[in-house]
């Protein structure tokens, strides 16, 4: 008699994805972030659902409905702060997941990688429209500034902006549609995650050595379910510490002031996880050029499979490329810091140098390093 998980049509899918999945025996803790992203997504959907039950997407009542959630709804403050800080946690895991993909050459699985980039764009869009919903000062002005960037598109730019706004400024129509987008996008992300996993399981997971591991694969359960559970415990500990002790640490104090179109905040800036892209945008004094650099700063990831010149997949045994990788990580952290600073010397020049270095490392230095390493290994 066959085991039910191997014969039942639905359980068979789960079995092939999470139980009997052949997995490399040597994948490290850096591979935990995929499952942690799944946890973050579920956390965001559930907390978001409960927030949506009490939130009103109207300019007159949006701000006070968030206040009502925090003050009057049972554990509303906890749900709200879990949702707000859950977004930060999501992006921390996302950036580490992408970093691991770059370090270990996972981008050579082109379909999985490209769907991952699409997921990154959708997650950024979801986070942006979600940040507008509390209708505080930074919500309003952030929405105004970022949507206005589309006006840089020749010919159709201004019409496109007014179409997205639903009027001649960010107002009630904008808030209502942003709430609709914020509600539907996580479900689209969930569907794409399934496709992401489908393509990943077609090829099997990569490993730190970047070598084929078909001869020594182990079942996913119990080895990696246990390992992932350990990651979940650590992540939730960190997350609840942040939520319960430092809930406003990653937010902007300006968002505790209701939106006022007549009063501009001294420094308009997005949430911390967009600051690196915002710094790249600001480093170019031309509006269209800045917008193109902003989009390309993410799209450049799609070029990685075509810029891979090394005969080794992973960076594990490539000291020159490793050095460049960690300079790139430092550069992204520098850009994040610059994005939160005012536009004045010395921040302007630091931002410009860091932006040039970002593209220089990815597009030119990393491929050259791969060729040099091939030559040194006499390959």
From Swiss-Prot:
GO cellular component terms listed in the entry, alphabetical order: mitochondrial inner membrane; respiratory chain complex III
TM stretches of this protein: 33-53, 77-98, 113-133, 178-198, 226-246, 288-308, 320-340, 347-367
Residue sites binding a ubiquinone per the record: 201
Gene Ontology biological process: mitochondrial electron transport, ubiquinol to cytochrome c
Cofactor(s) needed: heme b
Cofactor binding description: Binds 2 heme b groups non-covalently.
InterPro entries in the record: Cyt_b/b6_C, Cyt_b/b6_C_sf, Cyt_b/b6_N, Cytb/b6-like_sf, Cytochrome_b, Cytochrome_b_C_euk/bac, Cytochrome_b_N_euk/bac, Di-haem_cyt_TM
Main localization category: mitochondrion
Pfam families, per the entry: Cytochrom_B_C (PF00032), Cytochrome_B (PF00033)
Residues noted as binding heme b b566 in the record, renumbered to the chain: 97, 196
Cell location: Mitochondrion inner membrane
Keywords: Electron transport, Heme, Iron, Membrane, Metal-binding, Mitochondrion, Mitochondrion inner membrane, Respiratory chain, Transmembrane, Transmembrane helix, Transport, Ubiquinone
Binding locations of heme b b562: 83, 182
PROSITE patterns: CYTB_CTER (PS51003), CYTB_NTER (PS51002)
CDD domains cross-referenced by the UniProt entry: cytochrome_b_C (cd00290), Cytochrome_b_N (cd00284)
Topology term for the membrane: Multi-pass membrane protein
Source superkingdom: Eukaryota
Additional note from the record: Heme 1 (or BL or b562) is low-potential and absorbs at about 562 nm, and heme 2 (or BH or b566) is high-potential and absorbs at about 566 nm.
Complex and partners: The cytochrome bc1 complex contains 11 subunits: 3 respiratory subunits (MT-CYB, CYC1 and UQCRFS1), 2 core proteins (UQCRC1 and UQCRC2) and 6 low-molecular weight proteins (UQCRH/QCR6, UQCRB/QCR7, UQCRQ/QCR8, UQCR10/QCR9, UQCR11/QCR10 and a cleavage product of UQCRFS1). This cytochrome bc1 complex then forms a dimer.
Family according to the record: Belongs to the cytochrome b family.
Biological role stated in the UniProt entry: Component of the ubiquinol-cytochrome c reductase complex (complex III or cytochrome b-c1 complex) that is part of the mitochondrial respiratory chain. The b-c1 complex mediates electron transfer from ubiquinol to cytochrome c. Contributes to the generation of a proton gradient across the mitochondrial membrane that is then used for ATP synthesis.
Protein name as annotated: Cytochrome b
Organism: Cratogeomys castanops (Yellow-faced pocket gopher)
Gene behind the chain: MT-CYB
């Amino acid at each position: 008699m066959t085991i039910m998980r191997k014969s039942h049509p639905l359980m068979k899918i789960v079995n092939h994805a999470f139980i009997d999945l052949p997995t490399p025996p040597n994948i490290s803790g850096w591979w935990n972030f995929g499952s942690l992203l799944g946890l973050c997504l579920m956390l965001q959907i559930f907390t978001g659902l409960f927030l949506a039950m009490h939130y009103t997407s109207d300019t007159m009542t949006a701000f006070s409905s968030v206040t009502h959630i925090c003050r009057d709804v049972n554990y509303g403050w906890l749900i709200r702060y879990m949702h707000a800080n859950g977004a930060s946690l999501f992006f921390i895991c996302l950036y580490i997941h992408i970093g691991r993909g770059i370090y270990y050459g996972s981008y050579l699985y082109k379909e999985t990688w490209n769907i991952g980039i699409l997921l990154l764009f959708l997650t950024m869009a979801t986070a942006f429209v979600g940040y507008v919903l509390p209708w505080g000062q930074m919500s309003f002005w952030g929405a105004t500034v970022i949507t206005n960037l589309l006006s840089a598109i020749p010919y159709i730019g201004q019409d496109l902006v007014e179409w997205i706004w639903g009027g001649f400024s960010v107002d009630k129509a904008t808030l209502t549609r942003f709430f609709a987008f914020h509600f539907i996008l996580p479900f689209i992300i969930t569907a794409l995650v399934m496709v992401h996993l489908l393509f990943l399981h077609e090829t099997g997971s990569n490993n730190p050595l970047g070598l084929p591991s078909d001869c020594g694969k182990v079942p996913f359960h119990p080895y990696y379910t246990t390992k992932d559970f350990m990651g979940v415990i650590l992540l939730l500990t960190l997350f609840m510490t942040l939520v319960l002790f430092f809930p406003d640490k990653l937010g902007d104090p300006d968002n505790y002031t209701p939106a006022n179109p007549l009063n501009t905040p001294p420094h308009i800036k997005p949430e911390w996880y967009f600051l690196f892209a915002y710094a790249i945008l600001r480093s170019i004094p031309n509006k269209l050029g800045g917008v193109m650099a902003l989009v390309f700063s993410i799209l450049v990831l799609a070029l990685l499979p075509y810029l891979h010149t090394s005969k080794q997949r992973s960076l594990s045994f490539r000291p020159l490329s490793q050095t460049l990788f960690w300079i790139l990580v430092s550069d992204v952290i520098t850009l994040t810091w610059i994005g939160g600073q005012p536009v004045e010397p010395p921040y302007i020049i630091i931002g410009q140098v860091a932006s040039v270095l970002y593209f220089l490392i990815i597009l030119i230095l990393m491929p050259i390093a791969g060729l040099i390493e091939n030559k040194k290994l006499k390959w």
